[in-house]
């Protein structure tokens, strides 16, 4: 049985990946704060990474550890680079196995989305630039790598910060009005859906750059409306606004989203509809 070192195991994607991968691999789950039998690992520390790699000797590294707060990245670019680029470099130092790196649609400028793997990158935020630098490091290295770009991840977990899905559901259940942007377009992606794809990549030793996102390009307001519809909540509480009204520090790609033709043609994998994934979450909550 192959061994996987999983970083960022405490995040919303990490929790789900841990569950899926444990059935097929020997998984060593790590996080910056050691909880629930996970091992302590700060990927920004070269010594810490070296010690863990020597002890675990993994065949595969699944790197989910990152600084993903887009506005904080903009305010603290040094820290963003420390985790989003230098952390990956530390993981690769002396490692000769398969590294799986999660990336983002924020490597694009959001002017002409949705994008495929051959489209030119042009990040407009520190977060996007640091994630692109990480991609470029892997592509120019001699490592066996898989880069998976995704967007607008959502799911359910008790162990991580509430996702967009949980926030919308909880707000509407509490009869709270919420303001959602109507001018940012993506195809929202279920953590369950992405975790299954990652399992496939790890199991088949598939290398390269791939886009993975669920099927259904929509703006955030439409996504919130769809959540309200699927979970039978009061959608009149959802108010559409423009991104400019939020006065956010970092710029966001407006017309983004990811095309998945490459994985469909090369790997025979077709992502599910966004609504299908939401219905699965509703069923899961009822059980």
Language model: regions and residue ranges:
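N-terminal Rossmann NAD(P)H-binding glycine-rich loop of SDR-like oxidoreductase domains
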Residues: 2-23
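Rossmann-fold cofactor-recognition segment
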Residues: 32-47
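NAD(P)H-binding glycine-rich loop region in Rossmannoid oxidoreductase-like domains
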Residues: 43-83
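NAD(P)-cofactor binding segment of oxidoreductase domains
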Residues: 75-100, 135
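Mid/C-terminal beta-alpha module of Rossmann-like enzyme folds, strongest
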Residues: 197, 204-249, 254-255
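Conserved C-terminal active-site "lid" loop/helix of NAD(P)H-dependent oxidoreductases
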Residues: 219-225, 242-286
């Amino acid at each position: 049985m192959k061994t996987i070192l999983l970083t960022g195991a405490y995040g919303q994607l990490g929790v789900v990946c841990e569950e899926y991968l444990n059935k097929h691999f020997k998984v060593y789950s790590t996080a910056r704060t050691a909880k629930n039998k996970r091992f302590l690992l700060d990927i920004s520390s070269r010594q810490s990474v070296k010690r863990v790699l020597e002890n675990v000797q993994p065949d595969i590294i699944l790197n989910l550890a990152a600084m993903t707060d887009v506005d904080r990245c903009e305010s603290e670019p040094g820290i963003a680079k420390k985790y989003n680029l230098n952390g990956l470099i530390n993981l690769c130092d002396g490692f000769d196995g398969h590294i799986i790196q999660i990336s983002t649609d924020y490597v694009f400028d959001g002017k002409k989305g949705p994008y495929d793997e051959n489209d030119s990158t042009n990040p407009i935020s520190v977060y996007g630039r640091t994630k692109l630098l990480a991609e470029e490091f892997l592509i120019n290295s001699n490592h066996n790598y898989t880069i998976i770009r995704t967007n607008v991840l959502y799911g359910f977990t008790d162990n991580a910060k509430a996702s967009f899905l949980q926030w919308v559901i909880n707000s509407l259940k509490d009869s709270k009005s919420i303001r959602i942007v109507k001018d940012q377009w993506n195809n929202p992606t279920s953590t369950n859906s992405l975790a299954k794809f990652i399992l496939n990549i790890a199991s088949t030793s598939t290398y390269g750059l791939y886009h993975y996102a669920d099927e259904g390009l929509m703006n955030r307001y439409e996504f919130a409306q769809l959540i309200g519809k699927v979970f039978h909540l009061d959608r009149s509480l959802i108010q559409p606004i423009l991104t400019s009204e939020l006065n956010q520090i970092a710029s966001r790609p407006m017309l983004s989203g990811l095309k998945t033709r490459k994985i469909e043609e090369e790997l025979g994998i077709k992502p599910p509809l966004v609504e299908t994934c939401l219905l699965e979450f509703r069923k899961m909550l009822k059980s």
